[in-house]
């Protein structure tokens, strides 16, 4: 147990290195190089960005090994890759391949409708999505070393990411004011281990890095998520579905760095070209955020 705990501490320490940065979805070596040159702290290797997964439908699986290896060989920054929720075999394959981080992601079609992966059994660290404190702490209990909002990926609409971040921050604030017996009852209510709730109370935040993700499409969106308390930002379709990906990628990185400086944000937001076209979340047939439990 102590070995696993120590490993988790190392894993979450690795995730701390991403704080204040942008992690970008890429589908080719060329895109990965653009992301690295723009200042991304890591890239997420994918076969299709979330907007295309949403548009094309079908079963979305782990990217091909050839695709991931191509991206790993193209850049010197960490490379992440997604696996389906509960798909232990995909995760073992990616660990053997040598990716730096695995995202057990609701963007892909879930493989198990009852269980998430036991992430303690892996040496490679995992990031998982969450809509609230209960989901976040369940994933951390399973061994996640990093959390991100689920938002609504592939929409270019930040409203759901905002909702999830605000909800989580409000719940954390409530926890900091609770007595221990209240923590026990609250843990039962939200399905979270009381030991982790005690840690949240002590820290006044999640015990792991908490990024924003899902619908971030403009530098202003990225800055907004930082204002709401995010430690950094994942950008999926927002960069390479924009009119000028190079400019947009650089602008996203600068917006996360200077999120609290309106003068710089104004300058960043000028001459970046058209952002990706957004979708109204209320009109969606498939809500990826509802995948997972």
Curated annotation (Swiss-Prot):
SUPFAM superfamilies tied to this protein: Ribulose-phoshate binding barrel
Matching CDD domains: pdxS
Annotated active site: 82
Entry's Gene Ontology molecular function annotations: pyridoxal 5'-phosphate synthase (glutamine hydrolysing) activity
Pfam family, one: SOR_SNZ
Described purpose of this protein according to its UniProt entry: Catalyzes the formation of pyridoxal 5'-phosphate from ribose 5-phosphate (RBP), glyceraldehyde 3-phosphate (G3P) and ammonia. The ammonia is provided by the PdxT subunit. Can also use ribulose 5-phosphate and dihydroxyacetone phosphate as substrates, resulting from enzyme-catalyzed isomerization of RBP and G3P, respectively.
Sequence similarity: Belongs to the PdxS/SNZ family.
Name recorded for this polypeptide: Pyridoxal 5'-phosphate synthase subunit PdxS
Provenance organism: Thermotoga petrophila (strain ATCC BAA-488 / DSM 13995 / JCM 10881 / RKU-1)
Taxonomic lineage of the native organism: Bacteria, Thermotogati, Thermotogota, Thermotogae, Thermotogales
Gene that specifies this protein: pdxS
């Amino acid at each position: 147990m102590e070995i696993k705990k120590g490993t988790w501490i190392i894993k979450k320490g690795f995730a701390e290195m991403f704080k204040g940065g942008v992690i970008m979805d890429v589908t080719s070596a060329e895109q990965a190089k653009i992301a690295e040159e723009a200042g991304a702290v890591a890239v997420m290797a994918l076969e299709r960005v979330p907007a295309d997964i949403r548009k094309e439908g079908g079963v979305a699986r782990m990217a091909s090994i050839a695709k991931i290896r191509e991206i790993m060989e193209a850049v010197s920054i960490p490379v992440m890759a997604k696996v389906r929720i509960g798909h232990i075999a995909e995760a073992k394959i990616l660990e053997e391949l040598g990716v730096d981080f695995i995202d057990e992601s609701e963007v892909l079609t879930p493989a198990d409708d009852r269980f998430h992966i036991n992430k303690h059994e892996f040496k490679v660290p995992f990031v998982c999505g969450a809509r609230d404190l209960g989901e976040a702490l369940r994933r951390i209990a399973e061994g996640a070393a990093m959390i991100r909002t689920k938002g609504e990926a592939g929409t270019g609409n930040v409203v759901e990411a905002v909702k999830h971040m605000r909800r989580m921050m409000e719940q954390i604030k409530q926890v900091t004011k609770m007595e221990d017996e209240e923590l026990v009852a609250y843990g039962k209510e939200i399905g979270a281990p009381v030991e982790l709730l005690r840690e949240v109370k002590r820290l006044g935040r999640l015990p792991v890095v908490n990024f924003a993700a899902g619908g971030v499409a403009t530098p202003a969106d990225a800055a907004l998520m930082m204002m709401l308390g995010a430690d950094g930002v994942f950008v999926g379709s927002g960069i390479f579905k924009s009119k000028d990906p190079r400019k947009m990628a650089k602008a996203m990185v600068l917006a996360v760095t200077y999120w609290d400086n309106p003068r710089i944000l104004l300058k960043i937001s000028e001459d970046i070209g058209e952002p990706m076209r957004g979708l109204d979340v209320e009109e969606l047939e498939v809500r990826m955020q509802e995948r997972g439990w």
